[in-house]
């Protein structure tokens, strides 16, 4: 059994760690609330943009934008949104598993895969696995803007325009609540058929375009992709802070349990030490 002094040092070390994880839990909780506010503010725009684009896709257009047209899939692109830092439980690894499962399905069909990565964790993971990375951005901080993402988005859109990729997906963690973050692999291009799109087709909704459909769609569809990627980033940020808060709370609780266990061991060691001292005193007295 370890000595009482050694155990006391361990208890002090665990208490210091507990203070750190407790502080990180409070910081994560504060950041999560701010991230939720940004996420909630941008969600209506992203969802409305998706609906409008879905209605447009089902309209009777003379001009068919390339982003609305299906084509043979030979190469698939993924924009993967991860965190820059760890200490957030299995958030990143669960996301990467979902992405890899989807990539394997396309690889089984003979399609190649290109990646644009957001966040250091995605970069280190996929580069370690030998993936073909076309773009990478990191260090977005706690308040990312669309301008921070445009570079990576443009790389993938240019590849799509040039026929270098035939389908584009967004991979991110969707924030459901504090305890649940859902890995998502959403198709961006060509525009997927959704329930809203089916409803639009059923009711034959249409739009009048000014000045002309081509000019409007060329701009609107790019904004659509940018808005979906930005929404994915802020959803992932809220998910990160929620996962970190839960992970640090668990670490703090575990530290408390460990301190209690060590305290019992310390008490036993102290008791054994006192018993030995008394035994030695009694033995010495008996010898006299």
Swiss-Prot record:
Keyword terms: ATP synthesis, Cell inner membrane, Cell membrane, CF(1), Hydrogen ion transport, Ion transport, Membrane, Transport
An example molecular function term from Gene Ontology annotations: ATP binding
Top-level taxon: Bacteria
UniProt keyword Kinase present: no
GO cellular component labels: plasma membrane; proton-transporting ATP synthase complex
InterPro entries reported for this sequence: ATP_synth_F1_ATPase_gsu, ATP_synth_F1_gsu, ATP_synth_F1_gsu_CS
Alphabetical GO biological process terms: proton motive force-driven plasma membrane ATP synthesis
Membrane topology designation: Peripheral membrane protein
A Pfam short name: ATP-synt
Subcellular location: Cell inner membrane
HAMAP family: ATP_synth_gamma_bact
PANTHER family in the cross-refs: ATP SYNTHASE GAMMA CHAIN (PTHR11693), ATP SYNTHASE SUBUNIT GAMMA, MITOCHONDRIAL (PTHR11693:SF22)
Annotated family: Belongs to the ATPase gamma chain family.
Protein role: Produces ATP from ADP in the presence of a proton gradient across the membrane. The gamma chain is believed to be important in regulating ATPase activity and the flow of protons through the CF(0) complex.
Subunit structure: F-type ATPases have 2 components, CF(1) - the catalytic core - and CF(0) - the membrane proton channel. CF(1) has five subunits: alpha(3), beta(3), gamma(1), delta(1), epsilon(1). CF(0) has three main subunits: a, b and c.
UniProt protein name: ATP synthase gamma chain
Species the sequence originates in: Aeromonas salmonicida (strain A449)
Organism lineage: Bacteria, Pseudomonadati, Pseudomonadota, Gammaproteobacteria, Aeromonadales
